[in-house]
C-alpha cells in the first residue's frame, strides 16, 4: 500500500515492531529523503505533529493517530488544525491498524475531511511574511505571490 506512517520519535521502535511491512518514515533522516518518502505516499498516518505539518506542506493528506506511547492532551495538534481550518478531532478515535492499508478513497468521507488543510498554506505564509518584524528578502516574497 502507498500509505506512510510517520511516528513520533518515541513511537518509532513500537511502530517498526508492530508494522514491519509498512512504509515507516523516520523524520530523523536527511530531509531530502524524508520529503521524497512523504511525496511517494497516497496519504500519511502520523503520531507526530511534525509529520502532519511536513505532509501538508507538500499537499499530502495526513491524519493524526494518537497511540499510547506519547502523552499529549492534543492542544498542539488542535492549535495547528485551527490555523489551517481542519475540524478539531481526537487522534485516539482512529486506530492505525484499521486504517493503514486502505486506499485514500476507501477511507470514510469524515476521515478524508480531516486530512488536508481547508485554508491555503500559501495564504498563511503570505500573511506571516506580511507582518514579519524583520526584512524579508524579495526572492522569498516572490515565491508566495
Regions found by a protein language model. Give the residues of each.
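Active-site anion-handling motifs in enzyme catalytic cores
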Residues: 1-145
Amino acid at each position: 500500500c502507498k500509505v506512510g506512517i510517520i511516528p513520533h520519535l518515541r513511537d518509532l521502535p513500537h511502530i517498526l515492531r508492530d508494522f514491519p511491512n509498512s512504509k515507516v518514515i523516520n523524520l530523523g533522516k536527511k530531509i531530502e529523503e524524508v520529503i521524497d518518502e512523504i511525496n511517494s505516499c497516497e496519504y500519511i498516518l502520523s503520531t507526530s505533529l511534525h509529520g502532519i505539518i511536513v505532509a501538508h506542506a507538500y499537499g499530502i493528506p495526513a491524519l493524526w493517530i494518537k497511540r499510547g506511547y506519547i502523552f499529549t492532551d492534543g492542544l498542539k495538534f488542535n492549535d495547528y488544525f485551527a490555523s489551517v481550518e481542519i475540524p478539531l478531532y481526537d487522534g485516539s478515535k482512529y486506530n492505525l491498524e484499521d486504517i493503514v492499508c486502505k486506499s485514500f478513497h476507501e477511507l470514510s468521507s469524515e476521515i478524508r475531511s480531516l486530512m488536508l488543510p481547508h485554508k491555503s498554506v500559501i495564504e498563511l505564509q503570505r500573511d506571516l511574511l506580511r507582518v514579519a518584524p524583520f526584512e524579508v528578502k524579495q526572492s522569498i516574497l516572490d515565491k508566495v505571490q
